[in-house]
């Protein structure tokens, strides 16, 4: 398994993310009509949850917000909210919530 994943990332991986954040800050999302699922932890220590909440409030399309309640067995930074390696106790619930959301938006 370890052949296909890592817990260590080079700092150069942050450059594209920083560029994306800069671009997004300059955009207006109030006219967006695409539905969105916002699935995150209010205890995220990597991304300021209040900034996520502020972004959600500007989303023009229909949206659903799910605040993930992390456990002691999950990502200690409450940032990676699903996945068998970092947040194994969240994966099944995340799969169920996302699947339900997709089915729900397809009904309409």
Predicted regions mapped to residue ranges:
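Extracytoplasmic/secreted proteins, especially bacterial periplasmic and envelope-associated proteins
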Residues: 12, 16, 51-54, 93, ...
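Short alpha-helix in the alpha/beta-hydrolase fold that links the catalytic acid
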Residues: 34, 47-61, 67-70
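Structured segments of extracytoplasmic/periplasmic soluble domains
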Residues: 20-23, 58, 101-105
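Active-site nucleophile elbow and catalytic-triad environment of alpha/beta-hydrolase enzymes
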Residues: 11-29, 34
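Alpha-helical membrane-targeting segments
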Residues: 1-14, 45, 84
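Catalytic active-site module of serine/aspartate enzymes centered on a nucleophile-bearing elbow/loop
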Residues: 69-108
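Generic structural signal for well-ordered, non-membrane alpha-helical segments
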Residues: 6, 10, 48, 87, ...
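Short beta-strand/loop motif that positions the catalytic acidic residue
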Residues: 32, 37-40, 44
